[in-house]
């Protein structure tokens, strides 16, 4: 702030008055033509100030909207006298009378656009320094600047709308679950570190040196113990913690709608979850969604979309063409364990520059390149066309339904890479070509997930969801004899290409749980040390049970059309896992470390004094 502006702000402090017995009668978005003639009191922040001759106009803002107020020397000379001091983001209390705006001056884009409040008296509740960016929906401020001044960023109307919608979503979920006789029960934040899954955040114990609590990645074990306890319908809107790499739709701390039910199978859990999402969509956006949601198996999703959370709003599909090109002279096709193709109708007009950009994009997912063919009248244009025989071309036409004007993209290699590269390219093409309709919400279930997935780094099988997921009927022995073939009683709800929630029927047999731990490479002693309390609980009359958890942040991100979950979390971390506003994480004093029995091998640069 310049010295001149600082002096002005300091000078204006003399005008600041206490709130006293003034009380708001309305928010800044409530007043309409029906209130004309009424005396009101509104309070908020100055969005804009405009001097028009003798009149001073101020747009007053709170989290709900704007109201135009007018300082008129004819209506209230005393109120008008000092109005010239008002600046953007000053905090005002206004008493005045509602009157219609002059003819031709109404604003149909505002709920309060037919009226204005002419000021009879007012108070300056506080001044404000000049903000580092404009408090408007359209801002050129970088995200880092906005996060450093988050309390100002949250004043922007879009951000306020995001959090009002988030509140409505939470209230809607609570009402729905309460109607179904669920109990809202809190579970511990300080718990025990367990293997599997993402890294835990550890909290040292001051009273037990060398011992650590872990912040929960989810309330999974505790909600299962509640089922054993007889609390047969549980939910919680709960904060969870995972020490994992950040991205646009992930945070170190996040919120989920956590649900568990006893005496149920998959159908009952999924039906309950569909009803919940239908209610939330109706209560927040006024959108009716059709239930039951479509379903597809994990194998179908990976086969046709390359991902386990397909966006079905547009119809590009992947096709396995391995057999069609098995004998090809193009060696990459001939030798690859899997060759997949994606036909893009009308894509023949793509430029080489666009294709080169897509080629660079798929390299993110381990691909070496991107093969393509343009289908033109009388010819196939492509660097690989000369390697394809007439029989192979005919087989591709039959498999893909190729027509003149199409372009086909190919990927060949290991299934994991092929699916990741083409599956993500599919989404990028949908965005690039404008194939994805706005304001469309495509829900679906993905079912029959693998029970295990192979971890190349650890050279062992790990749980695909978590180690408490029940195998499908008839797959019990496969847990140890053929882990890759074992399927889980698991289900994910997907919305527009995002995993919205995931759940499963749980293991409620102590013997099956022991077998699961053994299949994951946990020896009996380690399993007892880490999960003995759970196994013991399962030996004491555990009912069949299952549940689901929805990512609250991700849900609200999708409902608000926000590009990142950081826009729907009040005080999020950056992608470097820092808080730019509070400067967390931070060093602590040597005394605090001594109290915890901790000695650092390297002293942080910002070590706190004693």
Swiss-Prot record:
Localization of this protein: Cytoplasm
An individual GO BP term: aspartyl-tRNA aminoacylation
Gene3D superfamilies: Bira Bifunctional Protein, Domain 2, GAD-like domain, Nucleic acid-binding proteins
Chief location bin: cytoplasm
Binding annotation for ATP: 242-244, 251, 499, 551-554
Binding site for L-aspartate: 196, 242, 465, 506
Matches recorded under InterPro entries: Aa-tRNA-synt_II, aa-tRNA-synth_II, aa-tRNA-synth_II/BPL/LPL, Asp-tRNA-ligase_1, Asp-tRNA-ligase_1_N, Asp/Asn-tRNA-synth_IIb, AspRS_core, GAD-like_sf
Enzyme category, top tier: ligase
GO terms under cellular component: cytoplasm
Chain intervals for the UniProt region annotation (Aspartate): 220-223
Function statement: Aspartyl-tRNA synthetase with relaxed tRNA specificity since it is able to aspartylate not only its cognate tRNA(Asp) but also tRNA(Asn). Reaction proceeds in two steps: L-aspartate is first activated by ATP to form Asp-AMP and then transferred to the acceptor end of tRNA(Asp/Asn).
Protein name as it appears in the record: Aspartate--tRNA(Asp/Asn) ligase
Species this chain originates from: Nitratidesulfovibrio vulgaris (strain ATCC 29579 / DSM 644 / CCUG 34227 / NCIMB 8303 / VKM B-1760 / Hildenborough) (Desulfovibrio vulgaris)
Phylogenetic lineage: Bacteria, Pseudomonadati, Thermodesulfobacteriota, Desulfovibrionia, Desulfovibrionales
């Amino acid at each position: 702030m310049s010295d001149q502006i600082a002096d002005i702000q300091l000078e204006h402090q003399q005008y600041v008055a206490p709130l006293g017995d003034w009380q708001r009668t309305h928010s800044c978005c409530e007043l309409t033509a029906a209130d004309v003639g009424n005396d009101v009191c509104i309070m908020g922040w100055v969005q804009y100030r405009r001097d028009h001759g003798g009149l001073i106009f101020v747009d007053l803002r709170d989290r709900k909207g704007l109201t135009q107020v007018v300082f008129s020397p004819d209506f209230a000379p005393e109120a008008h006298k000092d109005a010239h001091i008002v600046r953007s983001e000053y905090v005002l209390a206004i008493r005045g009378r509602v009157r219609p705006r002059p003819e031709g001056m109404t604003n149909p884009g505002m709920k309060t656009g037919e009226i204005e409040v002419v000021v009879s008296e007012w108070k300056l509740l506080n001044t404000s320094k000049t903000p580092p960016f404009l408090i408007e929906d359209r801002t050129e401020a970088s995200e880092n600047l906005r996060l450093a001044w988050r309390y100002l960023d949250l004043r922007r109307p879009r951000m306020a709308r995001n959090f009002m919608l988030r509140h409505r979503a939470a209230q809607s979920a609570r009402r729905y679950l309460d109607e179904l006789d669920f109990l809202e029960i809190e579970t511990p934040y300080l718990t025990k570190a367990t293997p599997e899954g993402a890294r835990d955040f550890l909290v040292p114990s001051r009273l037990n040196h060398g011992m650590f609590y872990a912040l929960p990645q989810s309330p999974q074990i505790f909600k299962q113990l509640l089922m054993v306890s007889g609390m047969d319908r549980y939910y919680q809107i709960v904060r969870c913690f995972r020490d994992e790499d950040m991205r646009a739709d992930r945070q170190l701390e996040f919120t989920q709608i956590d649900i568990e039910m006893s005496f149920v199978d998959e159908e009952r859990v999924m039906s309950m979850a569909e009803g919940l999402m239908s209610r939330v969509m109706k209560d927040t956006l006024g959108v009716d969604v059709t239930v039951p949601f479509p379903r597809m198996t994990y194998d179908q999703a990976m086969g046709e979309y390359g991902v386990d959370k397909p966006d079905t709003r547009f119809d590009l599909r992947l096709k396995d063409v391995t057999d069609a090109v098995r004998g090809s002279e193009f060696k990459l096709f001939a030798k690859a364990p899997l060759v997949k193709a994606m036909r893009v109708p009308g894509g023949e007009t793509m430029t080489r520059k666009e294709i080169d950009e897509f080629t660079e994009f798929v390299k993110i997912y381990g691909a070496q390149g991107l093969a393509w063919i343009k289908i033109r009248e009388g010819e196939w244009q492509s660097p690989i066309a000369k390697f394809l025989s007439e029989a192979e071309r005919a087989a591709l036409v039959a498999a893909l339904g190729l027509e003149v004007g199409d372009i086909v993209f190919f990927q060949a290699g290991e299934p994991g890479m092929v699916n990741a590269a083409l599956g993500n390219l599919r989404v990028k093409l949908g965005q690039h070509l404008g194939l994805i309709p706005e304001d469309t919400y495509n829900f679906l279930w993905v079912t029959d997930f693998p029970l295990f997935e192979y971890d190349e780094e650890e050279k062992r099988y790990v749980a695909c969801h978590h180690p408490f997921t029940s195998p499908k009927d008839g797959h019990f022995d496969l847990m140890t004899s053929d882990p890759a073939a074992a399927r889980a009683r698991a289900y994910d709800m997907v919305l527009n290409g995002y995993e919205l929630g995931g759940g499963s029927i749980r293991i409620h047999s102590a013997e099956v749980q022991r077998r699961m731990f053994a299949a994951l490479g946990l020896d009996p002693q380690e399993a007892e040390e880490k999960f003995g309390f759970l196994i013991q609980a399962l030996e004491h009359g555990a009912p069949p049970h299952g549940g689901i958890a929805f990512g609250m942040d991700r849900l609200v991100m999708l409902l608000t059309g926000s590009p990142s979950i950081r826009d729907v979390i009040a005080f999020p971390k950056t992608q470097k896992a820092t808080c730019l506003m509070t400067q967390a994480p931070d060093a602590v004093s040597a005394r605090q470390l001594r109290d915890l029995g901790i000695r650092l091998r390297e002293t942080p640069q910002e070590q706190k004094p004693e």
